[in-house]
């Protein structure tokens, strides 16, 4: 925020059938690993904020407007060849940019705040909730006492409640989504918070606490303990991850090994780095930080996305200094940063315009406020210990009915894609993917009422419900539960 709003408005920007294998590998996108490929059907709008619904479709906001569109994967479960269709818009007075979002345990999506509204500086506290079944966005009551206004961080706790930040101080507000709309909010004092929430991102940890790296009280980091309604120090990141002038900071990503890879903006002068952009690694078990590799060549992440990949690597989007064009993508493998292929608009964009979304196919969807939407296909694969495991399921299902499925690791080993205060695209919830044995057609069946919204749930038995579409293909089929591109081994079902 920095006294006056940072001006980060986007300027003008110059099929193979993959069958489900018996081992349950991901429904992979049909192009070369390690590369970005533009989706076949160009969207009829400038694509901005993406969210993954629990029926496998991706909804995307049109940049700076109230309009939304839906990307539906093709009949083989491939997003590269998916088709676009309009869905209901936000309420007519709400067209946010840089705001808080979440997909909830009941399958609805929710949005709050906005640093801009219809591309005008506003620090709006408006919000809305989306019901996919009714195809409606409905206005919600703003959080009290300034929470929810502007570019807010937000998080869904394992028990399903949604918390949004007050960017002006360390306070926040929380709601039980069952009260939405209109939403009943409870104010949470910023007890123990060392600085205000502005510019900081929140990462959900396996114990249900929140980790943040401070943008003002750097190099301090903090954890929010929900049971105590209190912030406590998580120690020094050792290297600075914020630009002290703009207070911008990079995204952080939970990895399967119980660490959080946090990235930084460099210290800049006249938008140029005067020292390298740093990274640091938080080990949850010890509560300690270790400096990671620096970004090379004057690159950093002064706002921008990152995403976990199925193999545990982290994809990050960098650019030079503060809001300077020239994107370079990297994969972090736990020790080093490795350059990868770049998106089509890399030369004409800074990192902050980009959004990532972890797809159930294992690919990473990218939007940048233009009609160029691309998917990154990682080259690595996952450790079998990270797979969801199905322990209880219906062997026979009837079209039009709802069923419960149980197992372990349904919510994945990470939150998925991250950004920070300006955008949240988490996908730590289970999807159900079904392949018909005769036609090999692939469909996602809507899940809802997940028993947890946690991460790295380990050996705990968790569950979700799934709806069998009335038009589902009948006969013998294979079902997998998938989270962040990692599927379970398939189980056999019969659709009647």
Segments from the language model and where they lie:
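Bacterial N-terminal signal peptides that target proteins for export
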Residues: 2-13
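Bacterial N-terminal signal peptides
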Residues: 11-21
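Boundary at the C-terminal end of the N-terminal hydrophobic targeting segment
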Residues: 24-28
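Short coil/turn linkers that define WD40 beta-propeller blade boundaries
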Residues: 34, 135, 180-183, 229, ...
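Immunoglobulin-like IPT/TIG beta-sandwich domains and homologous Ig-like subdomains
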Residues: 38-48, 59-60, 67-78, 83-90, ...
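Glycine-centered tight turns/hairpins at beta-strand boundaries that repeat
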Residues: 39-42, 49-65, 70-73, 87-90, ...
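Proline-enriched interdomain boundary motifs that mark the N-terminal boundary
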Residues: 137, 289-291, 383-392
């Amino acid at each position: 925020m920095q006294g006056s709003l940072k001006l980060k408005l986007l300027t003008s920007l110059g099929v193979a059938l993959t069958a489900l294998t018996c081992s349950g590998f991901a429904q992979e996108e049909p192009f070369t690993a390690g590369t970005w490929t533009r989706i076949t059907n160009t969207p009829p709008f400038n694509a901005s904020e993406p969210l993954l619904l629990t029926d496998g479709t991706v909804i995307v906001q049109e940049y700076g407007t109230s309009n939304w569109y839906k990307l539906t994967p093709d009949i083989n479960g491939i997003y590269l060849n998916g088709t676009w269709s309009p869905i209901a818009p936000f309420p007519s007075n709400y067209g946010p940019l840089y705001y808080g979002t979440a997909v909830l345990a009941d399958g609805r999506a929710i949005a709050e705040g906005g640093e801009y509204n219809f591309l005008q500086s506003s620090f709006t506290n408006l919000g809305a909730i989306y019901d996919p079944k009714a195809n409606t966005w409905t206005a919600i009551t703003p959080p009290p006492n300034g929470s929810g206004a502007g570019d807010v961080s937000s998080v869904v706790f394992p028990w399903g409640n949604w918390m949004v930040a007050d960017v002006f101080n360390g306070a926040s507000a929380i709601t039980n989504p069952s009260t939405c709309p209109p939403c009943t909010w409870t104010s949470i004092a910023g007890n123990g918070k060392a600085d205000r929430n502005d510019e900081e991102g929140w990462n959900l940890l396996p114990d249900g606490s929140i980790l943040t790296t401070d943008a003002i009280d750097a190099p301090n980091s903090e954890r929010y303990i929900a049971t105590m309604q209190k912030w406590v120090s998580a120690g020094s990141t050792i290297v600075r991850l914020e630009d002290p002038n703009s207070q911008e900071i990079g995204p952080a990503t939970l990895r399967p090994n119980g660490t959080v890879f946090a990235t930084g903006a460099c210290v800049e002068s006249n938008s140029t780095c005067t020292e390298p952009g740093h990274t640091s690694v938080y080990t949850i078990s010890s509560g300690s930080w270790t400096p990671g590799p620096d970004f090379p060549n004057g690159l950093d992440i002064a706002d921008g996305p990152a995403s976990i990949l199925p193999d545990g690597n982290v994809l990050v989007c960098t650019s030079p200094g503060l809001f300077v064009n020239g994107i370079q993508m990297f994969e972090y493998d736990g020790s080093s940063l490795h350059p990868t292929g770049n998106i089509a608009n890399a030369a004409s964009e800074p990192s902050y315009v980009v959004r990532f979304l972890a797809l159930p196919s294992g690919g990473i969807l990218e939007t940048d406020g233009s009609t160029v939407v691309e998917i990154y296909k990682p080259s690595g694969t996952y450790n079998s210990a990270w797979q969801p495991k199905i322990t209880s399921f219906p062997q026979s299902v009837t079209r039009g009915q709802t069923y419960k499925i149980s197992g372990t690791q349904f919510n994945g080993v990470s939150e998925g894609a991250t950004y920070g205060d300006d955008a949240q695209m988490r996908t730590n919830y289970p999807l159900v993917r079904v392949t018909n044995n005769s036609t090999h057609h692939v469909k996602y069946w809507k899940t809802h009422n997940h028993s947890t919204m946690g991460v790295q749930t380990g050996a705990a038995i968790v569950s979700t419900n799934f709806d069998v579409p009335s038009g589902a293909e009948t006969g013998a089929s294979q079902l997998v539960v998938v989270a962040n591109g990692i599927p379970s081994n398939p189980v056999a079902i019969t659709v009647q």
